């Protein structure tokens, strides 16, 4: 579904982690995002190549922008559909990722997503 070659080349050019497992999980993420987006408005970006460029690559580039220590805890306030925290958490499984959003419907999506991707993120609904 997504352009895995593009993501692999972006990650290689930036010395970012990229593996077949990450590629598969990002593809699953894109499929779930498009599927759930038909029921609720999660994102305006739903074309596979756009998801790869504007959601996944942009999120993964954050790993070079920030010096995130090993085993650090991150919180994504207003996470929406999980960007940038879910791709970052998938690329860096040592991180403890907390997802915070004010809408329960988004949290429901994120809990389903994290369960299917085996990402042990903590999802929090708060208002």
Which role fits each region the language model picked out?
Residues 42-68:
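SAM-dependent Rossmann-like transferase core, predominantly class I methyltransferases
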Residues 21, 47-50, 98:
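Conserved short-loop catalytic and cofactor-binding motifs
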Residues 60-127:
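Conserved SAM/SAH cofactor-binding pocket of Class I
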Residues 1-45:
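N-terminal auxiliary segments of SAM/dcSAM-dependent transferases
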Residues 22, 29, 51, 76-77:
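Residues at the start of alpha-helices and the adjacent loop-to-helix junctions
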Residues 13-15, 39-42, 48-49, 53, ...:
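Generic secondary-structure boundary/loop-capping signal
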